[in-house]
Amino acid sequence: MQIILLEKIGGLGNLGDIVTVKNGYARNFLIPAGKAKRATEANMKEFEARRAELEAKQAEILADARARQEKLDGQTVTVAQKAGVDGRLFGSVTNADIAAAIVAAGIEAVKANVRLPNGPLKAVGEYEVEVALHTDAVAKITVAVIAAAE
């Protein structure tokens, strides 16, 4: 199915691109989420009429993400978790725990933005973690996992 992208989508394209995707991806995700429209003549004309408005909205979203990225870059976030004598955690530190610690520090973040390529953190220590605030704004933070006081 051919669609018009209404925002930048990683791996697909930029605002205004006409791309071909699988029918299910378009019908079940992109179109209901407001990220795309079918590439019909009427929708193409409507998009061209709204192009400046959509570009301004995307620029505003990117500027907000860049501002949050500058606040986050280089920050150290501490997460306390119960741990054994050998430094291994009882349980693990997930992206939800890290997002909650970032929010507690006063910066907006959701768990879907926190990238843990090697899975949840399972030991005490410091870890480099990426927080993807936008496809063009990725902040690198340090997560310090410490043993919680009994």
From Swiss-Prot:
Any one GO MF annotation of this record: rRNA binding
GO biological process terms, semicolon-separated: translation
Keyword flag rRNA-binding: yes
SUPFAM superfamilies for the chain: L9 N-domain-like, Ribosomal protein L9 C-domain
Keyword vocabulary terms for this entry: Ribonucleoprotein, Ribosomal protein, RNA-binding, rRNA-binding
InterPro entries: Ribosomal_bL9, Ribosomal_bL9/RNase_H1_N, Ribosomal_bL9_bac/chp, Ribosomal_bL9_C, Ribosomal_bL9_C_sf, Ribosomal_bL9_N, Ribosomal_bL9_N_sf
Pfam families listed in its UniProt record: Ribosomal_L9_C, Ribosomal_L9_N
Cellular compartments per GO CC: ribonucleoprotein complex; ribosome
Task performed by this protein: Binds to the 23S rRNA.
Record PANTHER family: 50S RIBOSOMAL PROTEIN L9 (PTHR21368)
Family, as annotated: Belongs to the bacterial ribosomal protein bL9 family.
NCBIfam families: L9
Protein name: Large ribosomal subunit protein bL9
Protein source organism: Neisseria gonorrhoeae (strain ATCC 700825 / FA 1090)
